[in-house]
Amino acid sequence: MSGNNDAGQLGDGHYFDSEISDNHYNATTFKPVEKDGVKFRSVTATIYNSYAIASDGALYAWGQNAYGQLGLVSVGTYSGIYTPTKVDDAKWAVVKGRSTTIVGIHTDGTLWAWGKNLHGQLGVGADSETKECATTPEKVSDERWLDCASGFYHSTAVKADGTLWAWGDNSQNQVNSSTATIFTTPQQVGEDTDWTQVQAGVKMSAALKADGSLWTWGSNEESALGRAVEGKTDGKPMKAFDKVLSYSVGDNHVLVIKDDYTLWGWGYNLHGQLADGTNRNIDTPTQIGTAQWQTVAAGFYHSVGVQIDGSVWSWGFNRYGQLGLGDDNNRAELSKVDFNPEEGAVAEITTDSAVKVYPTVAEETITVSSDATISSVSIYNANGQKVGFKMVDGTQTSLNVSHLAAGTYFVATESDAGKSVARFIKK
């Protein structure tokens, strides 16, 4: 990790103190985060916090805890926890946040939230007058959910039935077109049933459909919606992009990897986070360079991505060294990150281990087996959307795929031997 460490969010056991000359205010190069041999399979960062899900599904958190956003009971500490600390005994599939409200999904599909509740964004039926914050994860819904996200004061999620929901602050119609300004419980957004993923910006959201189209709604502050309109929208998602392989939403900018692996972006660009060499906002989707990309992440005012060849690049705001380039200068162009192997490196992804998926042409169920102990299995469709997930603790498991549409799917496993990918066809 790299960047600002004023609340201990780098997880290196330190935090910034202006009274200490040898402080740890920031890190201008990427450094590893370690926790007693724990293997992490995913990580997410908010402004002041970091969260990681281990290979066994356990959730770890560190950083500021002023509103209980670490989920660790105690509150009121700006620089709260300096190293990864286990939150609870639950098994987590998804955890996301942007500021001081966190939402997550257990492996059983139930939806949870904790942290700040200024506009009812926890979704537990209470506003800030009755519940200012939740210091431990609270259940939002017993139903099964696929994905979730939180903005500054609103939250949004996708149910297992493909419906889209939102709640919290509605001052910019980031929930729906109602005149109500606050919703303390989830409200359905439209009637479509083909939503698969969702992410939230400060006052807007972007959701992906099964056909690979990306839709946005809420405030168009700083051109975040990807279309030339001013102010807030009518609360109805509108299509912003087609043929999406993956995408990421920052503060008010959006990055998309298209199905041809090209990178596109739009929105806020004051700090060069769209890498077009300028500081002007971009109203509509615009291609960024000509390289091909495998993954990208939009931060608050900066961006990081990995190209097809495995090289890591960063650009945008760099006041705290978050670009990992060894300095604190902003970049308005793509800038390659050089890793020092002694300080941490990108983990190798294994693609040739003895992981097998059978039958290779399936109708009801597939079986995944390996010589190593598998910790998790994810299923992705041809557009790169995750359509299935299961925690595992063994060398073999079965997954029901009867609900999937016909087509080609990829099975990604995490095991003691590393990461592997196999393919099967749903008949």
Locations of regions flagged by a protein language model:
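Hydrophobic loop/turn residues within beta-sheet-rich immunoglobulin-like superfamily modules
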Residues: I53, I105, V158, D192, ...
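Short glycine/serine- and acidic-residue-enriched loop/turn motifs that recur at repeat junctions
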Residues: G3-A27, G63-T83, G115-A134, W167-Q187, ...
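Conserved core positions of repeat-based scaffolds
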Residues: M1, N49-A52, A61, T101-G104, ...
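C-terminal outer-membrane/trafficking sorting elements
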Residues: T350-Y358, A362-K427
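Blade-level signature of beta-propeller repeat domains, shared across WD40, Kelch, NHL, RCC1
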Residues: A297-E343
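Short coil/turn segments that connect the beta-strands within blades of beta-propeller domains
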Residues: Y48, G57, T100, G109, ...
